[in-house]
Amino acid sequence: MDQKQIEEIVRSVMASMGQDVPQPAAPSTQEGAKPQCAAPTVTESCALDLGSAEAKAWIGVENPHRADVLTELRRSTAARVCTGRAGPRPRTQALLRFLADHSRSKDTVLKEVPEEWVKAQGLLEVRSEISDKNLYLTRPDMGRRLSPEAIDALKSQCVMNPDVQVVVSDGLSTDAITANYEEILPPLLAGLKQAGLNVGTPFFVRYGRVKIEDQIGEILGAKVVILLVGERPGLGQSESLSCYAVYSPRVATTVEADRTCISNIHQGGTPPVEAAAVIVDLAKRMLEQKASGINMTR
């Protein structure tokens, strides 16, 4: 699926929901005009906030031949470029930023989604067989199965046999859920209902792994299960969300190739609202083709 097809899907779904299609920002420079580039900053400072935009834009290459090229490269990516070297070693500020980002990523993995936040969203909360974060990280197999209490809760409080069941889980990034929730779940549910699909009761699974959606789909009799789960955080991005969609999942027979994944959902990647529109279209095609993953025809 190319960018033009994605834009057409987003435009169609957003129009059916009665919402305006977000327009891309106008370029800051005219075509052919030379961009105004700031001079690279090579001075290291212990007072600089390592998580600030200034620190991320820092250029550590001393006496560059083409400063404007470095500035444009630094603006074009969130990757660690233009950090410079001190002999064979990274510069102090580059190393400190690396350590700070690494610490932030570890914090994201270890944090818990607050119960108050889940209640504020009006979501039913269930758990996998995991009881705490340490067990979640060391026993991924238990994160693929619902607890007995969770099974009872789903059977008693959720709509049975829906066309589409939407599930939210913390996964390996708490920030991915809390940062993107309001911009992806409401338009996703609205788009599915606007498409005339029977949508199940959305709920939150604490300590869930991707394969847990197979058991959920089997218990509820869902035709399509959509799992929104936090991705493993990287050094530069801890708010990335993934969508794993599968048609008619079964614990015993569904394999990873049966899933369709849309990853990198966040403000710096695929915008959550745009992702919601693409997921709606994906769910419709899964129901039409009665397939998902590699079994879908393009």
Curated annotation (Swiss-Prot):
It is an enzyme of class 4 (lyase). It catalyses: ethanolamine = acetaldehyde + NH4(+). One of its GO terms (biological process) is amino acid metabolic process. GO terms for cellular component: ethanolamine ammonia-lyase complex; ethanolamine degradation polyhedral organelle. Induction: Part of the 17-gene eut operon transcribed from a single promoter, induced by ethanolamine and adenosylcobalamin (AdoCbl, vitamin B12). Disruption phenotype: No aerobic growth on ethanolamine (EA) supplemented with cobalamin (vitamin B12). A non-polar deletion mutant does not grow on EA between pH 5.5 and pH 8.5. A deletion allows growth on acetate, suggesting BMC assembly or maintenance is impaired. InterPro entries: EutC, EutC_C. The keyword Lyase applies. GO terms for molecular function: cobalamin binding; ethanolamine ammonia-lyase activity. Its cofactor is adenosylcob(III)alamin. Pathway: Amine and polyamine degradation; ethanolamine degradation. Gene3D superfamilies: 6.10.140.690, 6.10.250.2060, Ethanolamine ammonia-lyase light chain (EutC). Residues 1-19 are annotated as: Targets protein to the BMC. Binds between the large and small subunits. Its EC number is 4.3.1.7. Keywords: Bacterial microcompartment, Cobalamin, Cobalt, Lyase, Virulence. Artificial BMCs can be made in E.coli by expressing eutK, eutL, eutM, eutN, eutS (eutSMNLK) or eutS alone. Cargo proteins can be targeted to them using the first 19 residues of this protein. Beta-galactosidase (lacZ) was active within the BMC, showing the BMC allows passage of substrate into the interior. This can lead to the development of tailored BMCs for specific metabolic reactions. It is found in: Bacterial microcompartment. Belongs to the EutC family. Catalyzes the deamination of various vicinal amino-alcohols to oxo compounds. It is spontaneously inactivated by its substrate and reactivated by EutA. May play a role in bacterial microcompartment (BMC) assembly or maintenance. Directly targeted to the BMC. The first 19 residues target foreign proteins (tested with eGFP, mCherry and lacZ) to the BMC both in situ and in E.coli. The cargo is only detected by Western blot in broken shells, strongly suggesting this protein is normally found inside the BMC and not on its exterior. The basic unit is a heterodimer which dimerizes to form tetramers. The heterotetramers trimerize; 6 large subunits form a core ring with 6 small subunits projecting outwards. Interacts with EutS, which targets it to the interior of the BMC. This is Ethanolamine ammonia-lyase small subunit.
